[in-house]
Amino acid sequence: MSKKEQSLMTPYLQFNRSQWAALRDSVPMTLTEGEIARLKGINEDLSLEEVAEIYLPLSRLLNFYISSNLRRQAVLEQFLGTNGQRIPYIISIAGSVAVGKSTTARVLQALLSRWPEHRSVELITTDGFLHPNEVLKERGLMKKKGFPLSYDMHRLVKFVSDLKSGAPNVTAPVYSHLIYDRIPDGDKTVAQPDILILEGLNVLQSGMDYPHDPHHVFVSDFVDFSIYVDAPENLLQNWYINRFLKFREGAFTDPDSYFHNYAQLSEAEAVNVATALWNEINYVNLKENILPTRERASLILTKSENHAVDQVRLRK
């Protein structure tokens, strides 16, 4: 089979960096270098060039999809003779720990909110839907955070279902990485945004990923456009370890940090601890529960060194 024939067999259109960047068309840059610096994660290099070449074309594509979805809603309202409720367009972002999901989510939130339509964009992470530590300890799951069993999936599904049903105010629990737990009474209210970005390890998973807790609908059933942020496993491990080292010098030094004891480690000890955490927990979760969902995504961003995206795959 020729390469051309193979390319026709895949459900994705594939773009290298320059091909994708050309699809920006004339979309203006609406973020300053200072704003971009504030959006990036602790262990990432996010440049003006990266936003211009990767995220501006993506925001243009999403704007087309969102506008098309609004027209479809208007057609339905005209057919029914009703004034419909405001239904958010839901974008999900999945990928491994340390791949840069949160940065992708924050950049898209900033860009999409600055389109001429001035749409309201909310960002929610699924970390808030992890069971509280008290529950995880009772169930012996503290070392399985991020695995399917660790999430309150019924609450997460109800959250997205209520949003898609037009509920005026929906609450989401909020997670603190400082205390490594859900914040008691710290719920965030989401009030019918135009766009909701849902970021987390598990947003592409379906019912077959939760055989222990069967239910008829799943988060992915309510998502309009899904993104998977991908990278080679060796880079993911390096990024995870480097992020751990930066936390050791920063967030872990806070006496209130759940991981405060790690701040006392030497660099060599910290590397050993981070490597063990990666191999025993995060790598296992990636291989068993996250990576198998990649091909369910509408779009796959593949990163190389320095968190730079070098390939984009868009579902046909």
Swiss-Prot record:
EC code(s) of this entry: 2.7.1.33
Q: In which pathway does it act?
A: Cofactor biosynthesis; coenzyme A biosynthesis; CoA from (R)-pantothenate: step 1/5
InterPro entries according to UniProt: P-loop_NTPase (IPR027417), PanK (IPR004566), PRK/URK (IPR006083)
Q: Which Pfam families match?
A: PRK (PF00485)
Question: Which Gene3D superfamilies does the UniProt entry name for this protein?
Answer: P-loop containing nucleotide triphosphate hydrolases (3.40.50.300)
Detail which positions bind ATP. 95-102
- State the source organism's domain of life: Bacteria
Q: Which family does it belong to?
A: Belongs to the prokaryotic pantothenate kinase family.
The molecule here is called Pantothenate kinase
